[in-house]
Amino acid sequence: TDPSGRRLANAVHLELRCDGRAYGGCQTACPLFWKEAWLKPVSDAMTGERSTLDADPADKPLGEASCTEDDVQKATWGKDPGSADGKRYFCQATELLTYTTHLPWWDVRQYVEDYTSGNSTLRRLLKAFVYANYHMVARKHKFGIGTPFRWLYDRFQALIGGVPYPQRRGAIPDDQLTPVAALNLQPGDLVRVKSYKEILATLNTKLKNRGMAFDADQVPYCGRVHRVKTRVDRFLNEKSGRIMSLKTPAVILEGVWCQACYSHLRMGCPRALHSWWREIWLERVEESTPVDGRRFDVRRVDKSPS
């Protein structure tokens, strides 16, 4: 899959996520894409005697080319004898490449759009650009400057209370099995994300624990306290369209999603996908512990990860 971004014009995310009921019980909770042509400002929608949400569908005659709700339901899946439930699902995530276009990271217009649309502040964009350039230099191992550059980065971030260098290697060799923990976390449980150092001790050199990657954009949440939003046992494979089960369950935390501050070639992506957390990366805390929370707002979507 192309690791760079994708462009989707005239679209936004709302405070709505897919509940997975139409897709085999998928628990990923992806944010939904909404074309602006499908939406209407509340101030305009409420000027009539009743809103369009209350309108009777029979009031609007359907033409031959109209798409009904039944048509949409039928289009969500097809037969797939090789899958666990005999279905191949089609959703916005599985079909992303068909309705978006390639967006190279060097296209400056996307960053201008991030700022002018309100998706990002100027300060956040500048921090992301500084990190991207610093990382590019720090990974030049052949010049022998990678290690001291990463050390300097960590020292500076420690002084200002920032995020440590988020792209270090895990401690476990790839040919060894990574550890697991069974906390049996349930929705509503209060947990603290372990330190980055503790999490690296559970990852192999490819930054994976039992096949699940720990992303650089999860590092800012290390040490923070959140409630468990849901467990993840089933998810829709975006490449195959098949429902799959996790051999080692994970959880989603409330108010925690990818901020795309450290994403390679996808800086500033507004998709805000929920991060998945192995239980070994978390620890229970007392109910009296203050919770860190963030709000998921309406965002413009002009780029998205492929």
Residue ranges: model-predicted function:
Residues 188-192:
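Generic structural signal for buried aliphatic residues
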Residues 1-57, 62, 72-77, 83-187, ...:
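Basic/aromatic-rich interaction segments and small domains that mediate binding to polyanionic partners
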